[in-house]
């Protein structure tokens, strides 16, 4: 996904989360060489580490969420929690953005 397209998708995802009463804690958190977390949000004392994927259709976007990418996200989440000295409930979510809709997949690592 191009950076411009990615930024647009992330803005839509943030707006979507705010509409669901999430508090946006941080966006584009860079965890050194581990990777990046697109959106860190919080709701009901649970931190949500969100990966935003954008494509013309759902299937293409979801297929871009690979095991390797999930592994990097998990490492980035661990780094974030250690850096911020947080011991909190959390989950890793995916937000799939396409032209027509937004799909919110909570706790994708189960």
What are these regions (language model features)?
Residues 75-85:
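A short, N-terminal amphipathic alpha-helix
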Residues 83-110:
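Domain-level recognition of nuclease-like catalytic cores that cleave nucleotide substrates
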Residues 55-77:
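Mg2+/Mn2+-dependent nuclease catalytic core
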Residues 23, 47-49, 89:
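Hydrophobic "anchor" residues on beta-strands that sit immediately upstream
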Residues 1-27:
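Acidic-basic catalytic patches of nuclease active cores, encompassing PD-(D/E)XK
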Residues 32, 57, 99:
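Conserved protein kinase catalytic core
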Residues 37-58, 73:
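Conserved catalytic cores of phosphodiester-cleaving nucleases, focusing on short active-site segments
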């Amino acid at each position: 996904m191009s950076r411009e397209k990615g930024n647009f998708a992330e803005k839509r995802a943030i707006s979507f989360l705010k509409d669901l009463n999430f508090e946006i804690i941080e966006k584009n958190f860079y965890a050194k060489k581990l990777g990046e977390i697109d959106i860190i949000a919080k709701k009901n004392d649970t931190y949500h580490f969100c990966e935003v994927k954008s494509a013309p259709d759902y299937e293409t976007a979801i297929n871009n969420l690979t095991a390797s990418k999930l592994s990097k996200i998990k490492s980035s989440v661990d780094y974030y929690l250690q850096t911020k000295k947080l011991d909190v409930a959390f989950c890793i979510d995916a937000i799939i953005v396409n032209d027509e809709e937004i799909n919110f997949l909570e706790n994708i690592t189960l």
